[in-house]
C-alpha cells in the first residue's frame, strides 16, 4: 500500500467532525485523491451497525456487545472502502478509528486496553494510521457543547454519565502519550477558526510534498 491514512480522534463534543467538514475543501487540493469517511460506518452494512450502536432505545447493548459491534463495522469498512483506497495510493481521512475503541471501550467501559488492542488488531490486520489528530477538550466543556449544539440528536453514547466521558478523555491522553510519533494533539477548546487553522497547519507540515 502506498496510500496515506489519517485519523481524527477526540471525545464527543470536541468538534472533530465539524473540523473535518471545514478542512475538506483545502485538503482536497492535495496531489492525491482524498477519501473522507467515518466510523462506525463508511459503507452500507457498517452504517446499519452504526444505527444500532447509537440508537438511544438500545439500552440492552452491554459493553462487550458494543465493542464487538464496533469491531464488525470496522472490519467491513476497512475491507470495502479503506484498503481499496489505500492500495490505489489515495489519502483516506477517517473520523474515528481504532483509538476510539481503546478510549471508549477499553478505558470508558473498563474492558481493558489489552482486550481492545487485540480485537482492533484482529479486525484490521494491524492497520494503523500514518497520522492521528487528537482533538482535546475539557470534559465539562465538551458535555456542555453536546447539550447546546446537539440537543435534538443526542445518541446513546452522548447520554452516558459524565464519569464515563472523563474516563474516555483520560484514556485518550494516555494513548497519545504512548505513541507521540503518530499523534498530534490539537486544543479543541479554541474557536472553530483557530482549530481549523491549526489542523491544516499540521497536515501541510507533515505532508508538505503532497500539497
UniProtKB/Swiss-Prot annotation:
One Pfam family from the record: Thymidylate_kin
Reactions performed catalytically: dTMP + ATP = dTDP + ADP
Enzyme's top EC category: transferase
GO molecular function annotation: ATP binding; dTMP kinase activity
Positions of ATP binding: 10-17
GO terms under biological process: dTDP biosynthetic process; dTTP biosynthetic process; dUDP biosynthetic process
Superkingdom as given in the UniProt entry: Bacteria
Keywords: ATP-binding, Kinase, Nucleotide biosynthesis, Nucleotide-binding, Transferase
PROSITE patterns: THYMIDYLATE_KINASE
GO cellular component terms listed in the entry, alphabetical order: cytosol
EC number(s) reported in the record: 2.7.4.9
Gene3D superfamilies assigned: P-loop containing nucleotide triphosphate hydrolases
UniProt function note: Phosphorylation of dTMP to form dTDP in both de novo and salvage pathways of dTTP synthesis.
NCBIfam families (alphabetical): DTMP_kinase
Family: Belongs to the thymidylate kinase family.
Identification of the protein by name: Thymidylate kinase
Species of provenance: Lactococcus lactis subsp. cremoris (strain MG1363)
Lineage: Bacteria, Bacillati, Bacillota, Bacilli, Lactobacillales
Gene name linked to the record: tmk
Amino acid at each position: 500500500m502506498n496510500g496515506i491514512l489519517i485519523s481524527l480522534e477526540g471525545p464527543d463534543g470536541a468538534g472533530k467532525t465539524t473540523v473535518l467538514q471545514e478542512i475538506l475543501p483545502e485538503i482536497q487540493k492535495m496531489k492525491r485523491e482524498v477519501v473522507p469517511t467515518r466510523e462506525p460506518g463508511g459503507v452500507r452494512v457498517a452504517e446499519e451497525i452504526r444505527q444500532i450502536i447509537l440508537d438511544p432505545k438500545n439500552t440492552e447493548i452491554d459493553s462487550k456487545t458494543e465493542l464487538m459491534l464496533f469491531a464488525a463495522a470496522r472490519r467491513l469498512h476497512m475491507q470495502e472502502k479503506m484498503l481499496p483506497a489505500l492500495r490505489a495510493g489515495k489519502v483516506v481521512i477517517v473520523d474515528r478509528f481504532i483509538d476510539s475503541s481503546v478510549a471508549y471501550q477499553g478505558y470508558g467501559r473498563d474492558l481493558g486496553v489489552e482486550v481492545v488492542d487485540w480485537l482492533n488488531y484482529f479486525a484490521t490486520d494491524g492497520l494503523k494510521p500514518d497520522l492521528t489528530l487528537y482533538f482535546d477538550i475539557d470534559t465539562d466543556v465538551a458535555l456542555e457543547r453536546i447539550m447546546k449544539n446537539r440537543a435534538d440528536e443526542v445518541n446513546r453514547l452522548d447520554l452516558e454519565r459524565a464519569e464515563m466521558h472523563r474516563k474516555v478523555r483520560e484514556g485518550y491522553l494516555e494513548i497519545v502519550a504512548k505513541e507521540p510519533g503518530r499523534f498530534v494533539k490539537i486544543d479543541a477548546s479554541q474557536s472553530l477558526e483557530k482549530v481549523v487553522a491549526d489542523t491544516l497547519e499540521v497536515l501541510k507540515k507533515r505532508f508538505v510534498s503532497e500539497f
